[in-house]
């Protein structure tokens, strides 16, 4: 039951897929490609396919079909086999010459029954049967044009993208984000004849939209498979309203009943809503190199958790252009290179300064092993120094091949260190520290007035100034760290000034970024009127007020702000830190905010008896394994903090951190202001 179970779980799943792909054309969707990328790498898949041709394709409507000499196809899909997915499958197969089709879905058959509205009682009677998959197998043969051809449909739980032995992400759920009070109003308006929900505290599985509920069930199915792989029976806990729905669904997941009876090990699974603390998600206090890399470098296309590393310095190409396209980028994930993987894990677990020195050490050692003419230099590590070491490998193909993974991480580091965004990181940090002091000494209106002069139109901005998206990051920081607001005349006036300034800036942008296009619902600033811009900004501030009140339903974790005194400056105390400290509190108090989710009648009876008998309820520190799942994304610094904290508070306890995505500050405005949280796109 080691923490590296997240890696073996993923690799075991991929081995089942690889057993099917020999000489096949393989179609992957983005989330499965990301799981492969972090789990075992595309090279492993290509080796399993064999043959000289590259038969790897993206699963999309315009995907190229299989030619006359390509009789076999394998589709690896992270979604329900329904609606648009089935239509794309049909179209690809109909324009191909396949005689053998395998479809692998990461969603279990039980969830397919739920999606097809099969009642729970009827589904329970079908144990061992897979009618949905069997019907699709018939359809596949029909589309191939011969009922005697071969079709297979089966489930493999490829839920995770393992970033480190103790840390994994769920790419298929990257847009899953906890609800806000404004979503409660939307839920109420969609069910006018039912009891009105008063707050997020009233939200449960019976009140959510069918799409969101089904998305949660898909996640729960994958988590149940993970617990089965780890050999544990889980006790589920939650902090936050959406986390409660997910935890309750996992605790009562019917297909897991038999597994739980026979499991030898035990584990606590604690879900936490990201919205309860967005300060940590948008803040720049994390002294971590990887956080800076994922913020500075462009995203790897189709991925949510990796970046493009420009490899041109290792080629004979020369370009003076600033914005040329990177044809064959490097990346951070080095799943099949043990040395690079060791460096990557060191970067995740060390502070910025040590991490940069570690990169230099690895480059120097690699160059020495290859007998390259290295000039040693001590002192501060500079991007130029790293580049000079990397350039040594340029004309030595063998050395390049031997250390390709390491060179990608080295280039990522050098490119980040000299990136203008990294210099700005320190500006953010300084302003955030200033804000923390101001919040303790002044009213919110004064803090907003401090921000006002920083809101500048594009014609007046220098590289030092904040872009509209960066201003949104600062606003989220301010509202999240402040917490519940006292709404008075001064606050309303200060907010109105900031709103007008922001709306004007949006109108005057030379071109709207993809995020601003989503926020304003307009694709060009030329046609964006001040009136329309102001309506969009008003909606932003509704979300900001919601974020300020996000912890209002909590009793214990009400604040992430620690006021200053004579000896200490004001500071931010992460909610995750408070939760982990509470879990491992030596006196094991019954936490009011970490809610235990009972699984069925037995637990309810226990809870009932406990009112007049001494029945101990499960506590999250009871078991040797803690799985902490942050719903809505997590930062590298937070993962390190949790790992270090558990090791110091209860040595010997294993911890696995899971989350929907790896966060950089700019992800939060997207998830908060430009994502339909209630209606995820399931493709039907």
UniProtKB/Swiss-Prot annotation:
Instruction: Quote the Pfam families the UniProt record gives.
Output: Sec1
Q: What does this protein do?
A: May be involved in protein transport.
Q: Which InterPro entries match?
A: Sec1-like, Sec1-like_dom2, Sec1-like_sf
Q: Which Gene Ontology BP terms does the record give? A: intracellular protein transport; vesicle-mediated transport
For whether the record's keyword set contains Repressor, the answer is no
What superkingdom heads the lineage? Eukaryota
Q: Is Transport a UniProt keyword of this protein?
A: yes
The entry sums up its family as follows:
Belongs to the STXBP/unc-18/SEC1 family.
Q: What Gene3D superfamilies does the entry give?
A: 1.25.40.60, 3.40.50.1910
| Organism, as annotated | Homo sapiens (Human)
Q: What is this protein called?
A: Sec1 family domain-containing protein 2
Which keywords label this protein? Protein transport, Transport
